[in-house]
Amino acid sequence: MVVSADCRISLSAPSCIRSSSTGLTRHIKLGSFCNGELMGKKLNLSQLPNIRLRSSTNFSQKRILMSLNSVAGESKVQELETEKRDPRTVASIILGGGAGTRLFPLTKRRAKPAVPIGGAYRLIDVPMSNCINSGINKVYILTQYNSASLNRHLARAYNSNGLGFGDGYVEVLAATQTPGESGKRWFQGTADAVRQFHWLFEDARSKDIEDVLILSGDHLYRMDYMDFIQDHRQSGADISISCIPIDDRRASDFGLMKIDDKGRVISFSEKPKGDDLKAMAVDTTILGLSKEEAEKKPYIASMGVYVFKKEILLNLLRWRFPTANDFGSEIIPFSAKEFYVNAYLFNDYWEDIGTIRSFFEANLALTEHPGAFSFYDAAKPIYTSRRNLPPSKIDNSKLIDSIISHGSFLTNCLIEHSIVGIRSRVGSNVQLKDTVMLGADYYETEAEVAALLAEGNVPIGIGENTKIQECIIDKNARVGKNVIIANSEGIQEADRSSDGFYIRSGITVILKNSVIKDGVVI
C-alpha cells in the first residue's frame, strides 16, 4: 500500500478482490468505507468481512484508488469491474434440428433455420450474426431434419469467408447413431440433442469454456450476447433465461415465468393453458414497464435463449435429469426449484418465427419505415452467403413500401407492401400486394424463357397480368399469366399440394418448384 503526497491511497497493482464466501473468482464485493473509518484511523483490510486479496493472471489487474478529501472529509471507492467481457470463455449451441411442423410447407424440404427471410437471408443468419457481433467464435449448430440446404448455406457463408473466427470454429453436428441400444435414438428434444454431444465440453479445446449459450435457430432479433452473459455472471446464477414481457394473445405459446424482486425465477411453466395460464400472470412493472404497459403485457415469456454454467449443464443432462428431453418443458422448470435461475430482460424487438402467420407478418413488417427490426444496421450487420449478384433491374414499375432483393427483374408492374427475393422475375402488368417472394436459386436465360413460353410452359417467376395478394411464394415457383391468387373466399386451411399450394392461417403458400398454370384462380 502506498500513500502519496496528495493523500491518495493505492493498493498494489496485481491485487484483486474476490468473494471467499462464494468462491467465485469472477465476482467482486466492494468494501464500503464511512468517514470515520478513514479519518484518523489506520486502514485494516483484514477486518473487511468476506473479502480477501489474491494475485492471479486470470484476473483483470486494476489499481484500487481511495481519495481522501481533507476539507469535506469524504471518501470514495472507485467502482471496479473485474469481470472481463471475454467471449473466448463462451461456447454457443444453435438448435436447428426441429421438424418445423408449424412452419410447413416452407419446411417440407428444408430445416427451419434454412428458411429464407427478408429477401436475401436465412433464419440461421440471425443467431450466427449475433454471435459474430458479440465476439463469440465457438459455435455449434445441431441439425436433424432436412439439413442439406442448411449445411450448404453454413459452409458457404461462415467457413473461410474472412469473418475472423480466429482460433474459433463453426461446426455443424448432425444427429447420428452409434453402436449400442442407447445410440440408436435420434434427437428427442432440445435437451436430448445437447446431451448427445455433451462430450464436446470435455474435450481439451473446451477447457477454457465457462458458460454455454443455448440459442434457437428460428428467431428474429438483434442482441449482444455478452451483455446477457455479463449479467448472468454478475448475478452468480447457475442458469439465466432471456425473457420479454408478453400479452394475453400469445402468452400460451411460450414458456412463462414468475420472478422475485431480484430477478430470480421462482416458477416456470411451459406453454400453459386455461387456469394454469392465468396463474402465471404477474405485475410486470417489476421489469420496469409502466402501469399501462404492464396491464397490456401481464406475462413474462422465455425467449428460448439460455446461458448455463458449463459444469451445471453437464450435471443436469448427465446426472440430475438424464432422461429429460426438453429444456423448456423439463430442465428449466425442475431447475428453478433447485438451482439459481436468473431472468434477464431483453428490452428490444424479438419475434419467434415458428408459424406461417408469424413468418408472413415478420417479413412484411420489414417493409415499414421505421421498422421494428432492420437489416440495415452497419454497426451490427446480419451476415449471409456471398452471391455476387448484380443490382436489380426495374423497368417502368411502381414500388410502394417494398423490399427488392438483388439480381431481380421487374417490368411494368406494381409492387406494394411486399418483399421480392433474389433472382426474382416479375412480368408486365403484375400486381403484388402483401406478398413475400422467396426468389430463385438460379436464372433462366432469355432464350430458355422464350422457349418455355413458345411451348406453352411457365418460366420461373410471375407471368404477365397476374394479381397476387396475401401470399408466400417459395423458391423457383412458376406462376403463369393471368393468374389470380387472392383467397377471396377467406379459406383458413387447405392442402392442395397436387395443385402446387397450401393455405395456412388464411395465407396462400405456393410450393417450392411448383407450377401454377396460366389463368388459374386461387
UniProtKB/Swiss-Prot annotation:
Where does this protein chiefly localize?
A: plastid
* Superkingdom of origin organism: Eukaryota
Subcellular localization: Plastid, Chloroplast
- Family annotation (SUPFAM superfamilies): Nucleotide-diphospho-sugar transferases (SSF53448), Trimeric LpxA-like enzymes (SSF51161)
Q: Which GO terms describe its cellular component?
A: chloroplast; chloroplast envelope; chloroplast stroma
- Look up the transit peptide and give its residue range: 1-54
- The PTM Phosphoserine maps to 428
What's its EC?
A: 2.7.7.27
Q: Which GO terms describe its biological process?
A: glycogen biosynthetic process; starch biosynthetic process
Q: In which pathway does it act?
A: Glycan biosynthesis; starch biosynthesis
| Regulation acting on activity, per entry | Activated by 3'phosphoglycerate, inhibited by orthophosphate. Allosteric regulation.
Q: Which transformation does this protein catalyse, written as a reaction?
A: alpha-D-glucose 1-phosphate + ATP + H(+) = ADP-alpha-D-glucose + diphosphate
Which parts of the chain are coiled coil? none
- List, in alphabetical order, the Gene Ontology terms for molecular function in this entry: ATP binding; glucose-1-phosphate adenylyltransferase activity
Q: Which Pfam families match?
A: LbH_GLGC (PF25247), NTP_transferase (PF00483)
What are the protein's UniProt keywords?
Answer: Allosteric enzyme, ATP-binding, Chloroplast, Nucleotide-binding, Nucleotidyltransferase, Phosphoprotein, Plastid, Starch biosynthesis, Transferase, Transit peptide
Instruction: Please tell me in which tissues this protein is expressed.
Output: Leaves.
Assembly mode? Heterotetramer.
> PANTHER family from the entry?
GLUCOSE-1-PHOSPHATE ADENYLYLTRANSFERASE LARGE SUBUNIT 1, CHLOROPLASTIC-RELATED (PTHR43523:SF12), GLUCOSE-1-PHOSPHATE ADENYLYLTRANSFERASE-RELATED (PTHR43523)
**What's this chain's function?**
This protein plays a role in synthesis of starch. It catalyzes the synthesis of the activated glycosyl donor, ADP-glucose from Glc-1-P and ATP.
So what family is this one in?
Answer: Belongs to the bacterial/plant glucose-1-phosphate adenylyltransferase family.
Give the protein name, as stated in the record.
Answer: Glucose-1-phosphate adenylyltransferase large subunit 1, chloroplastic
* Lineage of producing organism: Eukaryota, Viridiplantae, Streptophyta, Embryophyta, Tracheophyta
